[in-house]
Amino acid sequence: MAPDRPMKILLTVHQFFPEYFSGTEVLTFSVAKELKKRGHEVCVLTGFPSRTHMPDEERFDEYDLEGMRVYRFHHAYVPMGGQTAVTEVEYDSHLTARYFTRLLRDLKPDIVHFFHMGRLGTGLIDAALAAGVPAFYTPTDFWSVCPTSQLLLRDGSVCAGPSRFGGNCVKHVAELTRGPAVRAVSRFVPTALVDAVAGLTAKGFLPQYPLRTEVAAMARRRPFNVNRLNWLSGIVSPTSLMTKVLRHNGVDVALILQSAYGIDIAAGDVAPARRVPGQPLTVGFIGTLARHKGCHILIEAFRKLPPAQARLKVYGNLSDFPDYATSLKALAGDAPNIEFCGTFPNAQVAQVMAGIDTLVVPSLWYENTPLVVYSALAAKRPVVVSDFSGLVEVIQDGRNGLVFKPGDVSALHRCLQRLADEPELLGVLSEACRRPKSSVEYVDELLMLYACPRAGTTPRAPRVFAPLEDTRGAGFITGWAVADNCAPKSVAVLRGRNVLGATDTFLPRPDVRDSLRRNGVTVGSEALGFAVTLKSAFAHDDLQLAITAQSGATKTLALSGLAIGASVALDEASYVGLDSARQPVTRANI
């Protein structure tokens, strides 16, 4: 039975409107809007990529979206929150958990529902349980067990999931992030060997070696995440594929409710697709223009059709992955029947569907039934899909669509040729398209789950995080420093003998390291960037910067001699530069 009183519900998602509007964001937003319609108070915690170095406390801001308060974390692939392993920060951000702890204290929600925890971390589950708030999860991809979220290897083949100690994940991530030399060597290193090394590293049995903390963090990733999923009050799995993956990786099946997504559906009946003989077939692609989505497979297959028989509309953001988008444009060439249409507001999805005859989802990964498939079915548009479990659970070959072998250009071409040659086939498939679940029905199910949570068997032992102090409006000084040809031990900002702020956390600045090396200065680390928070007003020329080396020796520099944007040598092995500074802002002016 659904709750009969208004509740305060806190949703989380890795990225959100208005900048991001793919399937997970659309699902989260539609659930939020439907909950609000029913009188519940809804707020959202989300993430946003930041390429700038900033103090930890400055990584959070807020905004309003259609009557909902959205709390935003500006993440980056750098150490933060006292954690030095970037791999660990991605799935267990202590900084975000501390901020979430403060949100839970201030908002006092009745329910937390996670729609994605990428870059936010499963430490949020610790925080929710420590606050006594029931927490639920809807996995929209495989992030909880796969560091790339897709179970897809660099060569395009699908992955069975992490090995025992994540050694295959260590290899895969290294191949993606460490350049061509690592990729060339990696294929000759047995995964079993990497797995053994990762396991011994995680247990502390091996001595220090480069990237040791990152390898250990990767080895801990899956068991850490799965353990926390087993503390939840319910998991809403959208497909049997997702249920299988979760169960295979150790998630308690008693927690799982399998329920397909719901979508916003326009009222009224929708006419089946009809095509007049002699008119070209209009094929549509709607989605992220990234290689794993397979749009290149579609364009290659489409170009095998006689130009007069069909036209192709590609909807997606060309700037998300510009190199891939350029390759798509090259594949399309000057074909007059291929159109790149950009993006569109989700409210226009029915209008876009009305402008195509069939949707193609040529994915190269284990798609978890993208929302666009349900939107096509709602519009009675047959769907041509890759033969992956998450897709063929919804699309049956020859009934409401066609199915082809993933990545097989010829097989997809044959499907498209059939639709082009047989106008009546489109009508038959369209008639069989059944109305999918609506957002209203989906939220009905969620509210019933909230009222009757599921019980797992894993003992709960959540960590307790201290709430992150609210320092919005604090000032700061950012820059970089080298002490004795290495990263400093600490940097402090002084006014006379008073310490105004200090940090012992340093951020990657490969640009600084490389610049110094070009000038003949050897630097043993790229972790040279600093950000010092300052809570009281300051005059730049009255400050000193104290740079402490790993040896404990300290050098002090008067900032009156160093302007923002400038750098200076303290001696032949120590250097410092300033990037930015900001005065504290009073609360009244925020």
Residue ranges and their predicted role:
Residues 424-452:
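A charged, aromatic-enriched C-terminal amphipathic alpha-helix characteristic of glycosyltransferases
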Residues 26, 290-304:
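A conserved mid-protein helix/loop that constitutes part of the nucleotide-sugar donor-binding site
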Residues 358, 382-385:
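Short hydrophobic beta-strand element within catalytic cores of glycosyltransferases
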Residues 144, 164-270:
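Donor nucleotide-sugar binding/catalytic pocket of nucleotide-sugar-dependent glycosyltransferases
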Residues 53-62, 248, 313-337, 348:
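Short, structured helix-loop element that forms part of the nucleotide-activated donor/catalytic region
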Residues 458-590:
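Basic, ligand-binding patches in group-transfer machinery
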